[in-house]
Amino acid sequence: MASTFRKSNVASTSYKRKVGPKPELTEDQKQEVREAFDLFDSDGSGTIDVKELKVAMRALGFEPRKEEMKKMISEVDKEATGKISFNDFLAVMTQKMAEKDTKEEILKAFRLFDDDETGKISFKNLKRVANELGESLTDEELQEMIDEADRDGDGEVNEEEFLKIMKKTNLY
């Protein structure tokens, strides 16, 4: 059953993950990251304290959870010095900004399916998109796709369920 969702082009036609080099930031984004870093590098040493990582990330509009913070710190502060260099901070923020962009892309795709703006993708929405894309899927196959993504059992796919299934299918 799960394979129906993965084989279909309905969700992937124009939203495939960009394959290639690591995500890169624009010059403006790099400047923004530099300014946030410099704000906390008060002694000009080129490093910030790991305790300030969360605050610096907040300055850039991110709200990392405690588990996320522990993981990031262990990845960038391998020698457990308690300090993070600008390059390490830039690497973390490049990844976080790419993840944010991915989520926004997925939500844009969700809104294309949810043309009646109910906050959910119904069977009718999915059938319309399949027809628009020229996909010849049976009603049964379309229903299987809904069932695969529908975690709360209401017969439709909400934003959270859509995000989960899209990440699970590795289309993003």
Swiss-Prot record:
Residues 1-14 have a biased composition (Polar residues). Ca(2+) 1 binds at D41, D43, S45, T47, E52. Expressed in testis. Localizes to the caudal portion of spermatozoa in seminiferous tubule and epididymis. Expressed in retina photoreceptor cells (at protein level). One of its GO terms (molecular function) is G-protein beta/gamma-subunit complex binding. Binds two moles of calcium per mole of protein. One of its GO terms (cellular component) is spindle pole. Residues 28-63, 64-99, 101-136, 137-172 form the EF-hand domain. It holds the Pfam family EF-hand_7. The keyword Iron does not apply. Ca(2+) 2 binds at D150, D152, D154, E156, E161. Keywords: Calcium, Cell cycle, Cell division, Cell projection, Cytoplasm, Cytoskeleton, Metal-binding, Mitosis, Repeat. It comes from Mus musculus (Mouse). Plays a fundamental role in microtubule-organizing center structure and function. Plays a role in sperm cilia formation. Residues 1-30 are annotated as: Disordered. Monomer. Interacts with CIMAP3. Interacts with USP49. InterPro entries: CALM/Myosin/TropC-like, EF-hand-dom_pair, EF_Hand_1_Ca_BS, EF_hand_dom, RNA-helicase_DEAD-box_CS. It is found in: Cytoplasm, Cytoskeleton, Microtubule organizing center, Centrosome; Cell projection, Cilium. GO terms for biological process: cell division; cellular response to heat. It comes from the Eukaryota. This is Centrin-1. Belongs to the centrin family.
